[in-house]
């Protein structure tokens, strides 16, 4: 059975056909609409899936935000242009006339990345560092989403009580500091207004402020990982996302994690499926029908 998998992120929308063998075909992308209106997202999703839906038997959505009863509830509305709520399952069922499931994108990615690990591992945490910071927890070989869909939203744990206000309403969240948006927001002077990709490029060229911003992000993530180890005693942490997979970033995180006491050390791995983990995880979960 072929699944039409959709990944809704803060920067882009992606869709692909995924067969029972896990192979990705006909992958497509569109920019995420920067609009507070649900119609803008509906229109973008319609354009994205219309060329693919005739070739699928079901739809699986991986989306940023809390997924509860098939709807997207934005924990940080800034990640979707200010959109607070969107009926994901209902909308895609209307657009495609296909049975549809939805799950948080980082939770979906965690499940895909778990499948790629050594068979002896039963407990892992996935972290995505991109527009925001998200996560997914696999414990005892099972994906943990929580009764309200909040499990794994580790980007909204505290990093600095005196830090910037996060879009979720808390002060000093990991996401507000370590994410691509957090890196860009903290930039000053000639880097003011630059996005995270530009800041990484400038860091590679020796720009001191850019390097400091990236080190600040990596240090914050390392402290988060130490907290995760203390909370879950996971066997490994897998890091993905556009920032997490940027050249040299994971090595920086490893350097800062090594400065923590040994009890909080844990193996760090780069995401095996890289930017396709959300799509694959959603399809795998649909195939397993465990949601």
From Swiss-Prot:
The keyword Cell wall biogenesis/degradation does not apply. Keywords: ATP-binding, Carbohydrate metabolism, Kinase, Metal-binding, Nucleotide-binding, Transferase, Zinc. It catalyses: an N-acyl-D-mannosamine + ATP = an N-acyl-D-mannosamine 6-phosphate + ADP + H(+). It holds the Pfam family ROK. Its EC number is 2.7.1.60. Zn(2+) binds at residues 156, 166, 168, 173. The keyword RNA-binding does not apply. SUPFAM superfamilies: Actin-like ATPase domain. Gene3D superfamilies: 3.30.420.40. It comes from the Bacteria. HAMAP family: ManNAc_kinase. Homodimer. Catalyzes the phosphorylation of N-acetylmannosamine (ManNAc) to ManNAc-6-P. Belongs to the ROK (NagC/XylR) family. NanK subfamily. This is N-acetylmannosamine kinase. It comes from Escherichia coli O6:H1 (strain CFT073 / ATCC 700928 / UPEC).
């Amino acid at each position: 059975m072929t699944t039409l998998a959709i990944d809704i992120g803060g920067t882009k929308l992606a869709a692909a056909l995924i067969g029972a063998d896990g192979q990705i075909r006909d992958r497509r992308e569109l920019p995420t609409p920067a609009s507070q209106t649900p119609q803008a997202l509906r229109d973008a999703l319609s354009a994205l899936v219309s060329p693919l839906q005739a070739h699928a038997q079901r739809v699986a959505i991986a989306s940023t935000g809390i997924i509860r009863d098939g709807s997207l509830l934005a924990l940080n509305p800034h990640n979707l242009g200010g959109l607070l709520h969107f009926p994901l399952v209902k909308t895609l069922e209307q657009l495609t006339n296909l049975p549809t499931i939805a799950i948080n994108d980082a939770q979906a990615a965690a499940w895909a990345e778990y499948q790629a690990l050594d068979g002896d591992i039963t407990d892992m945490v996935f972290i995505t560092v991109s527009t925001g910071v998200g996560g997914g927890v696999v414990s005892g070989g099972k994906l943990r989403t929580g009764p309200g869909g909040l499990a794994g939203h580790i980007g909204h744990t505290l990093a600095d009580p005196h830090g910037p206000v996060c879009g979720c309403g808390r002060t000093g969240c990991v996401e507000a500091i370590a994410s691509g948006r957090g890196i860009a927001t903290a930039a000053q002077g000639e880097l003011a207004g630059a996005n995270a990709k530009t800041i990484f490029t400038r860091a590679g060229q020796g720009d001191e402020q850019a390097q400091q911003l990236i080190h600040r992000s990596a240090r914050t993530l390392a402290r988060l990982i130490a907290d995760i180890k203390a909370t879950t005693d996971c066997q490994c942490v897998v890091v993905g996302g556009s920032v997490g997979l940027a050249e040299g970033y994971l090595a920086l995180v490893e350097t800062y994690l090594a400065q923590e006491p040994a009890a909080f050390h844990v193996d760090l791995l780069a995401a095996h499926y890289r930017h396709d983990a959300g799509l694959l995880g959603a399809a795998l979960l649909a195939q397993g029908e465990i949601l």
